[in-house]
Amino acid sequence: MLVIAHRGASFERPENTLPAFERAIELGADFVELDVWRGTVVTHDPPVQGRRYPTLAEVVELCRGRIGLMVELKRPRAGDVARTLELLEDDAVLVSFNRPALVQSRALRPGIRTVQHVGFGVSIRGARDAWAAGFYDARVTVRGVAAARALDLVPLVYTVNEPARMRELERLGVAGVFTDRPDLARQL
């Protein structure tokens, strides 16, 4: 099962920070997932003026050759997708609830892998051009996982922190979990 460190090792370190990403690397996660605003600022919520945030360029440099990157586009505006793609290497994965942003990313960089979150206004069929479908844990079903697999989508679930639930999802055919606890997920 793919272990995707949700905002880094956010159970142990402040989320979306360089120490959280470094810790995820130490714990052996397959990917770090991070949130990006306006294409370059790493934060889950809208940036607050005067506060220091890591930049996407800093995170790319930290992770290069050490761990995979999944970059979630938060409320992308015109130009945000292009700015984000300029900073990412070809093996990065873009994630979003925003289907048009992912369509645009694939047009700008054919072959880039994308994760379309489903269930909040986007159906499994709406994710058909993505690499993976991201399901919210409380809404994932056997039928949804099967539908994703039938469309050759990699089924991923967020945010799962209990080992028993991780094992259950693996039995359902889920390929990976976004987790605040990559330490526990790696032990499975």
Give residue ranges: language-model regions:
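Phosphate-group recognition and catalysis centered on beta-loop-alpha active-site segments
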Residues: 1-188
